[in-house]
Amino acid sequence: MQQKQRFTNVTLVTPSGEEDKDLLIEGDKIAQILNRNENLSDDWKIIDGHNNYIFPGMIDVLQHGFMNYLYGHAEENCTVDNAKLLPSVGVTGFLPSTPCLPPETTGDFLNALSNDIDKAKEGARVLGIHSEGPCFALAGAHDPKNLRNPSIPLAEELLEASQGKLKAVTLAPEMDGSEHFIKRLKKDNISIHLGHSGANPIDVPKFADWGVDAVTHMYDALPTYPADDTGVHVLSLTDALIAESRIALGLICDGIHVHPQLVELLSHLPTDRVFLETDSVKGAGSPTPVKFEFFPGRWCTVEKGKASTYNGLLAGSSLTSIEALQNYYKFSKKSLSQVAIAASLVPAKVIGLDNIMGSIAKNKLADFIILNKDNLEIEETFISGKSVYQNEQ
């Protein structure tokens, strides 16, 4: 018999606003949203929410690592262990993300990562793989030796090696071969993200026609232009991406990658246009500094709220999803409902899972977090209606 739970004395954060109502969970799904004074049969377990928020579980679609693991190292149990830890920072679903991999080992690596995902049975849902690269025009912190040109054979290699788990690919769509590469991936419903690109802004609508539907870390590794000789603002790639309504913009909301005022600017777009992603690396979530090798010869340090190389180049982030939530709420000055759309619903939509997760709504999976109303800290995390993390402080 399925467990029946009634969460009362809570404020539900839904896409339409904050609602002082009860949440009914039956088994692993949300059964109903109910007025507080409505009566039910007595077989429902009553849970007092202590006047806290119920917020949808967060979905991180760009995550290179967390705590002791970098997914680019393909260590055994990397996703198994992190799936158990991520609910502590509000994550109920994530895409372990890969950097630009050596061409000769890409297939073996993706196979190994896919096999590890198969073993992840507890904690946050491992929703698939995000291949950040290898088709970049601008390497950023990635190994430039591993950059490759897009092609149909490469698309098929990524699809086969990931064993059906590929959910998103980031590329620079101005590269030769991109159109056919993108269209091949779209046949398998892969989300295509523009990133590490120096594309001509005029071409953005064409890229959307091909199937580009999102941007990886908006404003980062996307060069802009100075004013021309007459003082006129020159259309930059980021301007064109803002203007293209078919593309959702991924945002690393740590106050370092994107200035808070730019975060506020993006928050004025329609709510389906912005989503939060961490781009976190090994050491994110750690209370002490962590040093690791991103690729042979490229050492990175995670400390003081950022991840960087020895010469100061940003190399992902140390951001956690709960910090991203808190920062977006602070920087955007928007409602908690709009924050939830960016943290949960739009990421789910980007990877085609918004019909079953991403918001507090009837018939969706009961993946949610209890947020303290005073400080927006996590009190408890639920996945499939079961408590998987409790804040003991």
Predicted regions and their residues:
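N-terminal metal-binding scaffold of metallo-dependent hydrolase/deaminase domains
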Residues: 1-41, 382
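C-terminal cap of metal-dependent C-N hydrolases
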Residues: 10, 349, 359-393
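Active-site metal-binding motif and surrounding structural segment of the metallo-beta-lactamase
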Residues: 37-55
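Metal-associated gating/positioning segment near the N- to mid-region
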Residues: 50-108
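Divalent-metal coordination cores built from histidine and acidic residues
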Residues: 83-165
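Conserved, mostly hydrophobic/aromatic
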Residues: 131, 185, 215, 328, ...
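Active-site core of metal-dependent hydrolases
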Residues: 156, 160-287
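His/Asp/Glu-enriched, well-ordered alpha-helical/loop segment
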Residues: 233-249, 267-278, 284-364, 368-371
